[in-house]
Amino acid sequence: MAINAQEISALIKKQIENFQPNFDVTETGVVTYIGDGIARARGLDNAMSGELLEFSNGTFGMAQNLESNDVGIIILGDFSTIREGDEVKRTGKIMEVPVGEALIGRVVNPLGQPVDGLGDIETTGFRPVETPAPGVMQRKSVFEPLQTGLKAIDALVPIGRGQRELIIGDRQTGKTSVAIDAILNQKGQDMICIYVAIGQKESTVRTQVETLRRYGALDYTIVVTASASQPSPLLFIAPYAGVAMAEEFMYNGKHVLIVYDDLSKQAVAYRELSLLLRRPPGREAYPGDVFYLHSRLLERSAKVSDDLGGGSITALPFIETQAGDISAYIATNVISITDGQIFLQEDLFNSGIRPAIDAGSSVSRVGGSAQIKAMKRVAGTLRLDLASYRELEAFTQFGSDLDAATQAKLNRGRRTVEILKQPLHKPLPVEKQVVILYALTHGFLDDVPVDDILAFEEALYDYFDAHYDHLFETIRTTKDLPQEAELDAAIQAFKAQSNFK
């Protein structure tokens, strides 16, 4: 058989033309320093800020400081096996977390990996942890109420869907209990809840998860935990991971409640990282961009326009104060970013007023427009009445003689304080809150002994459930009060057959 040189030449040329080089080109560097969750590496000249980098042991890090001769990296995981001289390579991606329905009911770390021992999470969706907040024209005004189930909040400092409401107070004043009760009250409200535990003890997180499970709230809740024993980078990244998971639902037209427990610990973790990365310290040794740390997180909570699905993220960030000082650096930063604050006071907590909400220092800047009409009508003057009672109470400690009008105000004030108390993990539907506050503001409790107020309240609910359920139904469906004459008659009928005189 004759060999045709031209044919062979043409064949070789064709092969060369069709050749696709299959090189895997990655930029690699060398670790020059490692310790305390921080690494420095040389040779990553083209690394991007926030880019995910992979170490030779499979651990990932995030590029933070891009300097002329090296890159400062925060390590997102175990750094005990990383050594100086180890290889680190660029991935070309920024950090993402898994998102979607599969995460609901699970406990995950800030990387989206399950830590509850219930197996892998099957999801294909991912979102970057750092994304721009919705712009002005992409937002809508807050107008839908978010009922927490706590009378003191829903009446005095109402929260709307899409709002950021700070919960601030000393340690052990019931901040977490307020948020957990708010989550429990979202059952059947078509809300997804995300609880982000930052720097908490693992035993504490376990207790909260068990509480959510016991009351059936884990069916619509994701728990993101970065416990106190984990490296600072994970504490720093946890809130951003939580809000990335929330954004997936918001941009699909759903409503989300996200709790950050607490942002003081995130600020401390960020200060630690910044000092280790040798960034210049500012006030209280926090870096200059600590305001931006929290503003870029909380601005991602919003009520978005109908064009984007009309979903919302409502944020309840926590700040822990020292000796009730709400004028501290981080506290004032977050107060200025949020749409209001609920201030929990240690003195009130210790005197048995729980939730220990200080009505004078607490405010909701946008929630009033989201409050239902019935609640507006019964709770309109409640805040002023309470403030006036506190003032009179302080004055009467001097033992002055009181006229009848002042005595009546004091009596009403004592009953108001009693009515606003609420047992732990027993959130109330809004229609029950409206009825008891109506009874209070219309003088039906003025002749009930203060010690019997809570028993009166329970008995009133039971009586209405049995005989006047249609009044509850009216408030539920119309969001307004039923006929006042009918409501008055129902409460009078209850008082006539009860032992509360």
From Swiss-Prot:
Gene Ontology molecular functions: ADP binding; ATP binding; proton-transporting ATP synthase activity, rotational mechanism
Reaction catalysis annotation: ATP + H2O + 4 H(+)(in) = ADP + phosphate + 5 H(+)(out)
Coiled-coil spans in chain: none
Residue numbers marked as site, Required for activity: 362
Signal peptide positions (record): none
Membrane topology reported for the UniProt record: Peripheral membrane protein
Presence of the UniProt keyword Ion transport in the record: yes
CDD domains membership: ATP-synt_F1_alpha_C (cd18113), ATP-synt_F1_alpha_N (cd18116), F1-ATPase_alpha_CD (cd01132)
Keywords of this entry: ATP synthesis, ATP-binding, Cell membrane, CF(1), Hydrogen ion transport, Ion transport, Membrane, Nucleotide-binding, Translocase, Transport
UniProt KW Transit peptide keyword: no
Subcellular location: Cell membrane
Family: Belongs to the ATPase alpha/beta chains family.
Assembly: F-type ATPases have 2 components, CF(1) - the catalytic core - and CF(0) - the membrane proton channel. CF(1) has five subunits: alpha(3), beta(3), gamma(1), delta(1), epsilon(1). CF(0) has three main subunits: a(1), b(2) and c(9-12). The alpha and beta chains form an alternating ring which encloses part of the gamma chain. CF(1) is attached to CF(0) by a central stalk formed by the gamma and epsilon chains, while a peripheral stalk is formed by the delta and b chains.
Function according to Swiss-Prot or TrEMBL: Produces ATP from ADP in the presence of a proton gradient across the membrane. The alpha chain is a regulatory subunit.
Name of the featured protein: ATP synthase subunit alpha
